[in-house]
Amino acid sequence: MELIEVKKLSKSIHGKEILKDISFEISQGDCVALIGPNGAGKTTLMDCLLGDKFLTAGEARIQGLKPTDNHLKQSVAILPQENTVVEDLKVKELLTFFQAIYPNSLSNQEVDDLLQFTDKQKNQLASKLSGGQKRLFSFVLSLIGRPKILFLDEPTSAMDTSTRQHFWEIVNQLKKQGVTIVYSSHYIEEVEHTADRILVLHKGELIRDTTPYAMRSEEQEKHFTLPLTYQSVLEKLDNVTDIEIKQKALSFATREAGQVWQVLQENGCTIEEIEVRNRTLLDSIFETTQE
């Protein structure tokens, strides 16, 4: 039996179908990224897996139990999209409170290693932390009870680059400890650094279940940028897409770069006039996510 099992899960809200016939399984120790455009259903799927939303159809099981089963409380932790830190308490007070809740909580040293806060930061009100610090603090609070399964919704939002990289290090430590992690993300680097698997959602449907490496290895599009003077040449080609005019440059995409380049050369284009870059399916998905 897999740790997390989802079978033909569907969810409708006010008559609108948000999730459509979704099925997948997650093994213990997997780190799985949910990606897709805004409104794809990532947060709703997490809510269903956590028992915060009832299913319209299908089923979900965690450790063989329904998500609403109280026996899961000690093994499952959640970092919601919005921080839920009590801001009028000091950082150290919140840490002490959370440590008192769990019978086998993280030690002060373990917390310090994860947070990397100064004594001054720990003695100040949580409201005084920066956005990225609050996010990291919320994440560490979710770890204090030593959960075996983590659900993280946009975990690194508001984090700067260094804090985000520290988060990735923590995730990789948790993976080595066998913690199962399911998270949503808008950052391609994050997925490439941490995810073992990728579930791609689009308009409420699970359209891909793959890995970062597999997506990177798939057929690539070439993106060309060249002077506007070649517009008439491109308009005669049927193997180019996404033609855009920006300032005095022309950009387009193609999966038949060799043929297109041959036509451009025949019409006087030189290598010095063009810029070419690769774009994989993974790049395309994250570009859509940013829109």
Where are these regions (language model features)?
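The feature captures the beta-strand-to-loop junction immediately N-terminal to the Walker
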Residues: 35-37
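Short, charged/small-residue-rich alpha-helical element at the C-terminal edge
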Residues: 221-291
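Conserved ABC transporter NBD signature motif
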Residues: 51, 57-72
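Catalytic Walker B motif of ABC-type/P-loop ATPase nucleotide-binding domains
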Residues: 150-154
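ABC transporter nucleotide-binding domain
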Residues: 168-251
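Conserved structural motif at the start of ABC-family nucleotide-binding domains
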Residues: 4, 19-21, 73
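Conserved ABC ATPase signature
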Residues: 125-129
